[in-house]
């Protein structure tokens, strides 16, 4: 069945151009990974063994991805073979070419021994001063950083089961299920029987404790944080899994665990298979950020079970995941909550697009060899992608019609890596009786156009009071002159009665100066009003332990030019490495005082993960 012409004319091969490997020539039947963590030397010694089977005509070479790893030897079926490390090609690293004399058998074992170096972008080493007291190491492999841990087929198109053994003087946690006897003699053993791409592998080692969260979930973190983490997430995971399994095929990954990383972790969460790595910033001490856990859990189907075949189709990972996250939270908290989250997400996408200096924000991107996949990640994949799926749901007959497709898609095609065109083939085939409706969708704008997607409508029942309050503040900021006038006009109890998500929308609206980003309101011209707002809502905003509130409060203070807040803000920038929070604050600070932003970054740069460090450096225009 052919797709409409607007789609067929753009159909492209699934080839991943972000890898230097010849992954299409081989199937990886199993991967055995032996790691040794050396904290004193800040090195990870690795021996990775791939069970490879040729997929077509015989090839004479294996090409693997590497980046800043020190190679020791390569073996094919236990015998050393010649290899060549070719000149580095930014941003993809150095191609490792393995050419055994006499060629390659149809099926063979390929073993690579290597050591990480100080330039490995996958690994962050933390000293005791950066943790609760003991050294710690963790990896972040998405999107193309696994190649700086071990030589590999570093592409989401290549999947295999894994067995991982880690020798470490401190407890280690890896993607997968920990095996009986793990930890004996300092060797930690994990099995991942479900095939995954290597970027979904993860390693952490340090002073790590463990507590149960439910019948099929545990939390790992430093002992000092264990009570808070168990309190935040205990009892929640099973409830989330039950709701997910109502919508999706059963969860196949064994336990669903959480690893709470040190504060330098660059993301809110990472869907490491079976054990999501999350930032401690998720702990709000009132469970108000736990939707992020639902998001990472939803990746167990979208991203981990069905994976984008290359990074130009990243929305198949993230757009689906946001859609599923909101379906699950809607089932738990009501449809109005789902609608509100969609509205909030679309508003944040519009702000991001306006602040992007001309970035594409197309849903399907052309990620060539010269493009770092890290740099094409944007809210478009998340929000535009989820909005497209919501649009499909509505156009095809609502959840009653769309839900059978969800189970069909993840049930029948689980384990595969797909492109947008393969997804569309599946969609058009399943809804063959509704082809006319599918053909009426503006696919060109949704998939390929830059900027905002076609506008959808959302219920505003949870947003109306928020917008009203924000507009009142903007109106009174112009009219009133004295702090006591604001105190008489506004009550702190109103904002306190809002949910955290509503408080976030309030702050977003206040920061941008109105419901629409098209405005000219300048908070620096209204210092009394800005100070009064923080005073009236001191109990809600000033005492919040939720990082989503804290970082927006700092953003507001910078927007309002409140220089007395700068010392607190610059100190806070050294306390967290979550890019969602620190990058906007650095950018805002740089727009006001570039020298202060640069000096603050230089003070804290070694606290950040290499991925975060490079991103901030680029944001600030520093070499």
Curated annotation (Swiss-Prot):
Q: Which Pfam families match?
A: Leuk-A4-hydro_C, Peptidase_M1, Peptidase_M1_N
Q: Which GO terms describe its cellular component?
A: cytosol; fungal-type vacuole lumen; multivesicular body; nucleus; NVT complex
User: What are the required cofactors?
Assistant: Zn(2+)
Q: Enumerate the active-site residues.
A: 296, 382
Relay the cofactor remark from the entry.
Binds 1 zinc ion per subunit.
Record GO terms (molecular function): aminopeptidase activity; epoxide hydrolase activity; metallopeptidase activity; zinc ion binding
Residues where Zn(2+) binds = 295, 299, 318
Q: What is its EC number?
A: 3.4.11.-, 3.3.2.10
What InterPro entries does its record include?
A: Aminopeptidase_N-like_N (IPR045357), Aminopeptidase_N-like_N_sf (IPR042097), ARM-type_fold (IPR016024), LTA4H_cat (IPR049980), M1_LTA-4_hydro/amino_C_sf (IPR038502), M1_LTA4H (IPR034015), Peptidase_M1 (IPR001930), Peptidase_M1_C (IPR015211)
Which GO BP terms, alphabetically?
A: cytoplasm to vacuole targeting by the NVT pathway; lipid metabolic process; peptide catabolic process; protein catabolic process; proteolysis
Q: What are the entry keywords?
A: Cytoplasm, Hydrolase, Metal-binding, Metalloprotease, Nucleus, Protease, Zinc
For the protein in the UniProt heading, the enzyme class is: hydrolase
Per its UniProt record, what Gene3D superfamilies does this chain match?
A: 3.30.2010.30, Neutral Protease Domain 2, Peptidase M1, leukotriene A4 hydrolase/aminopeptidase C-terminal domain, tricorn interacting facor f3 domain
Reaction catalysed by this enzyme: an epoxide + H2O = an ethanediol
* Residues bound to a peptide: 140-142, 266-271
Per its UniProt entry, which superkingdom is the organism in? Eukaryota
User: What does the sequence similarity comment in the record state about its family?
Assistant: Belongs to the peptidase M1 family.
Q: What's this protein's function? A: Aminopeptidase that preferentially cleaves di- and tripeptides. Also has low epoxide hydrolase activity (in vitro). Can hydrolyze the epoxide leukotriene LTA(4) but it forms preferentially 5,6-dihydroxy-7,9,11,14-eicosatetraenoic acid rather than the cytokine leukotriene B(4) as the product compared to the homologous mammalian enzyme (in vitro).
Q: What is this protein called?
A: Leucine aminopeptidase 2
* Species this protein is from: Eremothecium gossypii (strain ATCC 10895 / CBS 109.51 / FGSC 9923 / NRRL Y-1056)
The beginning of the lineage is: Eukaryota, Fungi, Dikarya, Ascomycota, Saccharomycotina
